[in-house]
Design a protein with these regions (language model features):
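PLP-dependent class I/II
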Residues: 1-142
């Protein structure tokens, strides 16, 4: 930043308050979030149930090649038996089954053409409905 010589100290003080640490309000909010154990556990329980549903239902749809998720709330699935164009596959699923999944090409430009990513960070009702739609889609087209 270029400022007049006599303003340097004031700009330094301002910069320190803006960039050295998160704003005070954000820090207080983060602390409150950390104290929300019941809500956090409820979300974790929903994600766990949703993960179990997809791990059971995806193979029934023919999507059997995946590593069990360990960490976030995503399942990466190998679709090389059906397509080597994950973007086109995801577009077709969206247009035909009204289910949004993410093409692997978004994460790996070299090997992502044959993978897709499912998120299970939705309501359990949505996951059950999405799994049904995926099964119907796969049985219709593959």
């Amino acid at each position: 930043m270029v400022v007049p010589e006599d303003h340097i100290r004031q700009v330094e003080r301002l910069s320190q308050n803006l960039f050295v640490c998160p704003p005070h309000a954000s820090q207080v909010t983060a602390l409150a979030a950390l104290d929300s154990n019941d809500e956090l556990q409820a979300n974790v329980d929903v994600y766990k149930k949703n993960r179990e549903i997809l791990l059971e239902e995806l193979p029934k749809a023919g999507l059997k090649k995946f590593s069990p998720p360990d960490g976030a709330f995503y399942i990466y699935v190998d679709i090389s038996d059906y397509s080597n164009d994950s973007l086109a596959f995801c577009k077709k699923v969206l247009n035909e089954a009204n289910v949004a999944i993410t093409p692997g090409i978004d994460f790996d430009q070299k090997r992502g053409n044959s993978t897709i990513r499912f998120s299970y960070a939705r309501s359990t009702k949505d996951i059950i409905e999405g799994a049904k739609r995926i099964k119907d889609f796969m049985s219709k087209y593959y």
